[in-house]
Curated annotation (Swiss-Prot):
It catalyses: an acyl phosphate + sn-glycerol 3-phosphate = a 1-acyl-sn-glycero-3-phosphate + phosphate. One of its GO terms (biological process) is phospholipid biosynthetic process. Keywords: Cell inner membrane, Cell membrane, Lipid biosynthesis, Lipid metabolism, Membrane, Phospholipid biosynthesis, Phospholipid metabolism, Transferase, Transmembrane, Transmembrane helix. Probably interacts with PlsX. One of its GO terms (cellular component) is plasma membrane. It is a multi-pass membrane protein. The chain crosses the membrane at residues 3-23, 61-81, 87-107, 117-137, 144-164, 167-187. It holds the Pfam family G3P_acyltransf. It is found in: Cell inner membrane. This is Glycerol-3-phosphate acyltransferase.
């Protein structure tokens, strides 16, 4: 019963769309109706930048931090309390699933990059660092957020086998579940990348 309560709480917490809340409160804008209609930091920056560039950067950064924290903080607490690895990985998956398929948004949501990074920094920090470097380099070169995110995801998966071939839970299944969720949410971006129609973020 205790585990079920934890899982429900994490899903509900993960479902909170901070980008949507921040832009409605501070920018009086509904990002679900503008830009890419995503609730993530990239769309926050893109939409709010048209009206207030300085505010756009602040809200985008705040969105990243809060989306990151809603996965990282609960996992840190549970890890400190010595919950087992199976539960921690389940919590990580649920936090990301909640962000991507929010119950508050009729199971729509973001794309899971910041929340995924928040979850994985607790469980696989070296892999997240590797992914961050790839994300930063790809973003710097191509200036395309989705391409940088997908490249980082690939780097994360590969490095998870290099640095942690035998995870404590003896399976990489949660890594692939998380990757599947993120790739699924990026399918429209992948299509635009193939046809060279994806917008740059400058």
């Amino acid at each position: 019963m205790e585990n079920l309560i934890i899982y429900a709480f994490i899903y509900l917490l993960g479902s909170i769309s901070f980008g949507l809340i921040l832009t409605k409160f501070f920018a009086k804008t509904d990002i679900k109706k503008e830009g890419s209609r995503s609730i993530g930091a990239t769309n926050v920056l893109r939409v709010v930048k048209e009206k207030n560039p300085k505010l756009a950067k602040k809200l985008a950064i705040a969105t990243i931090i809060l989306d990151f924290a809603k996965a990282a903080i609960p996992l840190l607490i549970l890890k400190f309390l010595h919950y087992d690895q199976a539960l921690l990985w389940s919590v990580a998956v649920l936090a990301i699933f909640g962000h991507c398929f929010s119950i508050y948004l009729l199971f729509e949501g973001g794309k899971g990059i910041a929340t995924g990074a928040g979850a994985m920094i607790v469980l696989l920090p070296l892999e997240v660092l590797t992914a961050f470097i790839v994300w930063a380099v790809t973003g710097k070169i191509f200036k395309i957020s989705s391409l940088a995110s997908l490249a980082a995801l690939l780097a994360f998966i590969v490095s998870s086998f290099i640095f942690n071939y035998d995870l404590e839970i003896h399976t990489h299944a949660p890594v692939f579940i998380i990757a599947f969720i993120i790739v699924y949410k990026h399918l429209p971006n992948i299509k635009r990348l193939i046809f060279k129609e994806e917008c740059k973020v400058i």
